[in-house]
Design a protein with these regions (language model features):
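Catalytic phosphate/metal-binding cores of nucleic-acid and nucleotide-processing enzymes, i.e., regions
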Residues: 1-110
Length: 110
């Protein structure tokens, strides 16, 4: 896949996740839509997560999660939303994060 078509595929996945978050009541937009934003999470949102969106044929969870954690905003755990083949709705995709970050989030719902 060429670089430009790969970027378009990634942009579509990010837009789909942003729409899903908005449907759930979070403010969300792609960081690509904000001029001059480089690095950091793929989405700008008031959701308490720092989200990295992936739509790739080959799954590279360790590298993706390392990237999400490295680029996470302070106080927001990094999480990867990875598109599941054949599933257009992001609610059916995979969400991957470190166990420690998940437990920290769950601690607040006890």
């Amino acid at each position: 896949m060429s670089g430009s078509s790969s970027r378009r595929k990634g942009a579509r996945a990010e837009q789909a996740v942003a729409r899903m978050l908005r449907a759930w009541g979070w403010a969300a937009r792609t960081s690509r839509s904000v001029q001059g934003v480089q690095g950091g999470a793929d989405l700008i949102t008031d959701c308490p997560l720092s989200i990295e969106v992936k739509d790739h044929q080959r799954v590279e969870l360790a590298a993706w999660l390392d990237q999400a954690v490295r680029q996470a905003e302070p106080g927001r755990p990094g999480v990867v939303f990875a598109k599941k083949r054949g599933k257009g709705n992001p609610e059916d995709w995979y969400a991957v994060m470190r166990v420690a970050d998940l437990l920290a989030l769950l601690k607040d719902v006890r």
